Curated annotation (Swiss-Prot):
Stated name of the protein: Nascent polypeptide-associated complex subunit beta-1
Keywords assigned by UniProt, alphabetized: Cytoplasm, Nucleus, Phosphoprotein, Protein transport, Repressor, Transcription, Transcription regulation, Transport, Ubl conjugation
Basic and acidic residues biased stretches: 126-142
UniProt function note: Component of the nascent polypeptide-associated complex (NAC), a dynamic component of the ribosomal exit tunnel, protecting the emerging polypeptides from interaction with other cytoplasmic proteins to ensure appropriate nascent protein targeting.
Subcellular location: Cytoplasm; Nucleus
Entry annotated with the keyword Isomerase: no
Residues of the NAC-A/B domain: 38-103
PTM annotation, UniProt: Ubiquitinated by the NOT4 E3 ligase and the UBC4 E2 ubiquitin conjugation enzyme.
Record PANTHER family: TRANSCRIPTION FACTOR BTF3 FAMILY MEMBER (PTHR10351)
GO biological process, alphabetically ordered: 'de novo' cotranslational protein folding; cotranslational protein targeting to membrane; macroautophagy; mitophagy; protein transport
Assembly and interaction partners: Part of the nascent polypeptide-associated complex (NAC), consisting of EGD2 and either EGD1 or BTT1. NAC associates with ribosomes via EGD1 or BTT1, and with the CCR4-NOT complex.
Note: Present with 18000 molecules/cell in log phase SD medium.
Native source species: Saccharomyces cerevisiae (strain ATCC 204508 / S288c)
Source taxonomy: Eukaryota, Fungi, Dikarya, Ascomycota, Saccharomycotina
Amino acid sequence: MPIDQEKLAKLQKLSANNKVGGTRRKLNKKAGSSAGANKDDTKLQSQLAKLHAVTIDNVAEANFFKDDGKVMHFNKVGVQVAAQHNTSVFYGLPQEKNLQDLFPGIISQLGPEAIQALSQLAAQMEKHEAKAPADAEKKDEAIPELVEGQTFDADVE
């Protein structure tokens, strides 16, 4: 079947102006949700239920002392304990803080190691403070006292 070139050119011209077929709608991808974290929480809750964990209410804060002197501080915390299995679970968002940031309210929570570290820190601070005034006096000796009417312009030239 022969194709008429004139009709073909006319059809191509019309098809260039008119789109054939519908517009494709972009499908919104499902946003990444916290379904994975929620799934982990449900697994954890089921395991705690198997251990007969008991929820402890009215816990204001919890602090975990790390070896490097930092403290993991839980401000609002949920606690579940399974004493027969020696298991404790703490829920919340921890903030890593320095030990100095939590004073003086944290002193009652410190163990013997932390109190010893605190006394060493205080001794270091006292040594540093005693050394600082001596350094300041040495710096003052190098600075000449200004006398009214005396200029150093001649010495500079």
